[in-house]
């Protein structure tokens, strides 16, 4: 006796997501880990530290290291929560139906005045 296999094909969604960038949120470093407690500093967002430019001979290495240090709390960027920011792309088929119905109403309201 043979079993039948049914395959259902689904249409792709009209919305596509693409990753635009990365943002770093609140600091999650536990400052009381050595004593067995839990204490965070309350830094809400990663702010890259700027290099002071005080005659550092390391040049680009010093600038890169400063970009990974938070100016607000002094922690490394890896302690901050990483948040990926997505861009939503819509298909033109969905938008064309809405714009065609709204454009005559706006033109008719202009002509009636």
From Swiss-Prot:
User: Which residue ranges are recorded for the region named Disordered?
Assistant: 93-113
GO biological process terms, semicolon-separated: regulation of developmental process
Where in the cell? Answer: Cytoplasm
Q: Which GO terms describe its cellular component?
A: cytoplasm; nucleus
Give the residue range of the signal peptide: none
- Membrane-crossing residues? none
Zinc finger spans (ZF-HD dimerization-type) are 24-83
Biased-composition ranges, Low complexity, are: 97-113
The lineage's top-level taxon is Eukaryota
The record ties this protein, via InterPro entries, to: ZF_HD_homeobox_Cys/His_dimer
Q: Which GO molecular function terms does the record list? A: DNA-binding transcription factor activity; transcription cis-regulatory region binding; zinc ion binding
Keywords, alphabetical: Cytoplasm, Metal-binding, Zinc, Zinc-finger
| Role according to the record | Inhibits zinc finger homeodomain (ZHD) transcription factors, by interacting with them to prevent both their nuclear localization and their DNA-binding properties.
Record text on subunit structure and interactions: Homo- and heterodimers.
Recorded hits in PANTHER family, A to Z, give:
MINI ZINC FINGER PROTEIN 2, ZINC-FINGER HOMEODOMAIN PROTEIN 2
State the protein's name: Mini zinc finger protein 3
What species is given as this protein's source?
Oryza sativa subsp. indica (Rice)
